């Protein structure tokens, strides 16, 4: 197995990030520093990162979390805020979030130790759909505003791609995007005159929040993980 893939399977980082870790000289194999991500290794190769020996690939798992507002979607936080890792009991597995969800947003977030899958779900080329429900200000949402969201709107970092948009109530919309820019849904809604008051992610690819209570988590079934891999 290639060294970068081995690190990803061991839960160190996504495969792309693992390649950077290797090239930075932070990885040793049998006590020798290795900077080639393509180096072949196996469970007997005595791989270490920053001097810490790896036990070998962990069983690959994916958890769904219903993140509350105020919880940050990072593995650790320098300001001492609670993180999504505190919502999951995973028997010591090294999990990390698949993408981000703003601290002031809530809803569905995935955690995994499968670096290859995480990369597939977040890389722009795969256009994985993510669905949100937004409560907005600015009065009743017009069909004109919805049409603009469906076409794509101009943002400060370039136009957004066409999105799925439908009105659920006068001030609530469901929005499905296939991009993952910073605070994108909030910026799109503001661009059509409807600043977001409350935002919840309810869908990620084929997965839905579906009754998972706020602050709770569950491990995805094999079938659910395979559906994610098929995206």
Label each region the model flagged:
Residues 1-231:
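Basic, flexible Lys/Arg- and Gly-enriched helix-loop patches that mediate nucleic-acid binding at interfaces
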